[in-house]
Amino acid sequence: MTAVRISTGIRASRNQAIVDIKISLCHLSSMELMLTQLRACAEPTRLRLLALMALGDFCVVELTDILGQSQPRLSRHLRLLVEAGLLERTREGSNAWFSLAQTGLGRDLPAKLPAIDATLQADRRQAERVLAERARAATERFRRDGAEWDEMRALGLPAETVEAALVADVETLSLPEGATLLDIGTGTGRILELLAPFIGSGLGIDASRTMLALARSRLSRARLRHCSVRQADMMRLPLPDASFDLTILHMVLHHSETPGAVITEAARMLKPGGTLLIVDLAAHERQDLTRALHHRWPGFSDAEMRRALTSAGLQAIPAATISGPIDIAIWRAIRPAGTTPAAFTLKAASIHD
């Protein structure tokens, strides 16, 4: 077997290092990859870290609190686990967040560890304390920032009915086994929680750290380890083309300056044959609500949305409408098989052009 050097050297940028690591791992045979990963986790602290990640995402500061070890020591262990493809690392401001890999040994190994082990049980108790503190802090920050309001409730909309309609729509899709979901503008992570039973892995994107903190707490409470969240700009998603089977924009577009461009970026994420679902306000004339809730757009007509979806290279399907004080529409569009992101156009800067 060929020896493969995984470390990328100190001169590489952090992002380039992660790319180089993934490229190196792709060139390993199945046997070489397993040996590399087994060597990486064959150490007590690293096994403890993997067991903890089954409870959710953690940052380094939280892990030092849970395990009682120094940050430099834990950072080295985490780096080795990331290099071996057992953990994934994402940056959010000054914090680095770590989660289990969504496939392979990283995903499967924690379930094989002895749940009755005294050390692992103690770690779980400490982790539950940290997660509870995180949830309290997130809720307090939510209140302090003046953001504790539910837009659906403020609009007098039937949230439960809308969610039931979304689930019913997803149930009609022929999603592949282990389907991948991207929730753009995830907010508190409710859509990830709602659709978790239908997917193999889910990723929520949001620009707000406050919302991400709430989403992480929600996912941790629900034990949804196959779902995670990441800070990113929905106009410039730091993700490869054609990565997801299902992409969702839930009550996002009426806040966006350029909803057409957001749709185009969401379309870029879809695998051939993948589906984009958009839940948003139908066109309305309630200017009082538009001003009070700082909406950028007074909903969207079916013609406007179909035009934007077509401009993004998608095949639009007739929308379903949910009646209320303001109607809610669920639009569905499919990326045709055989198309590539190069076939998409970026001219749809605004749906209302």
List each model region and its residues.
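A short glycine-rich, Lys/Arg-flanked "PGG" loop and its adjoining helix->strand segment in the class I
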Residues: 260-275
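Amphipathic alpha-helical dimerization/coiled-coil segments
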Residues: 16-21, 25-30, 105-153
